[in-house]
Amino acid sequence: MIVIPAVDMKNGKCVQLIQGDPNKKHVELENPVEVAEKWVSEGAEMLHLVDLDGAIEGESVNRELIKEIIQTVNVPVQIGGGISVRCTESNLIEIGAKRIILGTVAVENPDIVEEISKKVGKEKVMVALDAKDGKVVIKGWKEKTKYTPVEMGKILEEKGAGSILFTNVNVEGLLTGMNVEPVETLVEELEIPVIASGGVTTIEDLIKLKAVGVEGVVVGSAIYKNLIDLKEAIKACR
């Protein structure tokens, strides 16, 4: 199982938010490129980049910063935030993204997943499923859908998603620990790989996730707040 550090960008800085609220930050660091280099120097084999400005604006805003990180580090990156128009997917793949992460746009219109998968390759298309109280939520976690993660996951899998990024919104950014059960259910029900995110606080959380068969785990606040040592986490998950 791969441990994937998150580098979330807002206004050109690296931040970690509480419950996705731009007004509530655990962390704010000046240079996202230096942060990315730090995690790679500690053994990260992949990075998770999120353009938070893009998520709000609906299109990729920090594209040049993302490009600089990709050119600077020597590991694959997956990119999310504001990927809602077709030209953006191609642009991000062209600048070197291993995977692009589709969110609300894919849940609202799963046919887009099929279209983009045919265009750039299934393996490059990840869809983010954010769940709150057992239902998929969209539009910055503000709107609840009628679908469970498994129901939507199966639709997206059929449409050509190459992988799923599952976030438990109930625990995201709170540093309260991981709820493994919904992740395990998703892994059991889907054929495509699942990456978990949200609430990881200890290496024990990571070991539990490895046991249920996730391909990887995105870690954010816990490594920025020094609750988890990245080197030790990577070692424990090999």
Swiss-Prot record:
It catalyses: 1-(5-phospho-beta-D-ribosyl)-5-[(5-phospho-beta-D-ribosylamino)methylideneamino]imidazole-4-carboxamide = 5-[(5-phospho-1-deoxy-D-ribulos-1-ylimino)methylamino]-1-(5-phospho-beta-D-ribosyl)imidazole-4-carboxamide. Its EC number is 5.3.1.16. Coiled coil: none annotated. One of its GO terms (biological process) is L-histidine biosynthetic process. The lineage of its organism: Archaea, Methanobacteriati, Methanobacteriota, Methanomada group, Methanococci. Pfam families: His_biosynth. GO terms for molecular function: 1-(5-phosphoribosyl)-5-[(5-phosphoribosylamino)methylideneamino]imidazole-4-carboxamide isomerase activity. Its main location: cytoplasm. One of its GO terms (cellular component) is cytoplasm. SUPFAM superfamilies: Ribulose-phoshate binding barrel. This is 1-(5-phosphoribosyl)-5-[(5-phosphoribosylamino)methylideneamino] imidazole-4-carboxamide isomerase. The keyword Isomerase applies. Keywords: Amino-acid biosynthesis, Cytoplasm, Histidine biosynthesis, Isomerase. InterPro entries: Aldolase_TIM, His_biosynth, HisA_bact_arch, Isoase_HisA-like, Isoase_HisA-like_bact, RibuloseP-bd_barrel. The keyword Cytoplasm applies. Belongs to the HisA/HisF family. It is found in: Cytoplasm.
